[in-house]
A protein has these predicted regions:
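Extracellular, repeat-based ectodomains that mediate carbohydrate processing or recognition
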Residues: 1-131
Length: 131
């Protein structure tokens, strides 16, 4: 379990982390008696988060082996990647914010090709993927 701490534009700090099958967050400073808030219950692996447009965005692999992008408090989660019929596996998820856009870099293992490839997608833009 590794905490990721983010500071928002209003100065509020947020700690976000995965534990067991849960994704949790809490506002800082953390006072005695406060409990973290569970936002997801289907976490499996590969947790990564960034602040994008003053919102904490996070990505992870869920229990169904799909890659999910979600935000703290804003809108529904989005399925970004699925394993498909070829049996892909995903790892090394890395969110990057650059020039006002959000990018997801990841590696995918293809059972057919027996190797990893490096890919990038822009989760908030349709059909914007690259190798």
């Amino acid at each position: 379990m590794a905490y990721q701490i983010f500071e928002m534009s209003d100065g509020q700090r947020v700690a976000l982390y995965a534990q067991g099958n849960s994704v949790l967050y809490c506002l800082l400073p953390f006072a005695r008696g406060m409990l973290p808030i569970e936002v997801k219950r289907d976490y499996l692996a590969h947790f990564e988060a960034r602040v994008f447009r003053d919102t904490v965005c996070y990505v992870y692999e869920n229990l169904e082996h799909t890659i999910i992008l979600d935000t703290l408090g804003n809108g529904p989660a989005r399925i970004i990647l699925t394993d498909g019929p070829l049996g892909y596996g995903f790892c090394n998820l890395h969110l990057v914010v650059r020039d006002g856009d959000l990018y997801l870099f990841y590696q995918a293992f293809s059972g057919r090709e027996k190797g990893y490839g490096l890919y990038v997608c822009m989760p908030y833009q349709e059909n914007c993927r690259g190798v």
